[in-house]
Amino acid sequence: MADFGKEAVAIEVHGVSKSFLNAEGGSFKALDEVSFAIPKGSLAVVSGQNGSGKSLLMTIIAGLEKPASGYIRTNSKVGLVFQDADSQILGETPLEDVCFGLSNTGVRGSRAKDAASKALKKVGLYEKRNSPSHFLSGGEKRRLAIASILAMGFETIIMDEPYSNLDYAGVKDVNRLIGDLSASGVTLVILTHEIEKCLALANKFMVLKKGCLVFDGTPLAGLSLGAETWEDWGIRNPLLSYPTLDSLVWK
């Protein structure tokens, strides 16, 4: 049971299910009785094949979807960084973009600019605060989305496929920020099938398969399971290409 009185748990998911209609007029379970807890300050990596339910689960946690059954409890505001970071950028410059998000919470004027500047410094974009947003690289756009979330006081951040379409330098920049945020106590949940790029940063690893949570443990425990288990999950054990858990991070 999550101990919210002591603020030990950032996210508690209990018995969450969600169904949708299929082409034949029946229904299928996109999520099936999923339960887990993520301790406050953790860095959790969630993996699984496309269609496993991981993105749907996280939109439910962020409050953008409702479960058909079960419940979600969070101990702080949860921000979601979408795979397509462009969809979250509404300002013509990074400073305008972060201020726009703050304006929706009632923070405007000099207070908004101060908070936005602080957040942009934290993600390494302050020097580009007045540059056109559309000129930012893919990694910079993800950092801008994170800056907007930080400025609004979110203490838990979910990132959906944060390495999608990034080159090596972009991955390193995102991982550097992930490491800094984790060290500062922010709870992070990373949804990715590219676990070789970040698993060494994590202290929690979960795998979804066809809407079911099939593994919930430490990265080392998951990596120690046999090849048949990974084949059943439909994802590739990165230790087939990398020597140790410590090497599973691009930096």
List each language-model region with its residue ranges:
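Catalytic Walker B motif of ABC-type/P-loop ATPase nucleotide-binding domains
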Residues: I157-D160
